[in-house]
Amino acid sequence: FDKNQPWGVIRDLNVVNFKR
């Protein structure tokens, strides 16, 4: 994800949590 994009970080966390 891009650190410049806050929503990118949140989205990445959601994807990891979902896969987990």
UniProtKB/Swiss-Prot annotation:
Instruction: Could you list this entry's UniProt keywords, alphabetically sorted.
Output: Allergen, IgE-binding protein, IgG-binding protein
Q: Which GO terms describe its molecular function?
A: IgE binding; IgG binding
Q: Which domain of life is it from?
A: Eukaryota
Tell me yes or no: is Secreted among this UniProt entry's keywords.
Answer: no
Q: Which residues form a coiled coil?
A: none
Can you say what this protein is called? Allergen Asp fl 2
Organism listed in the record: Aspergillus flavus
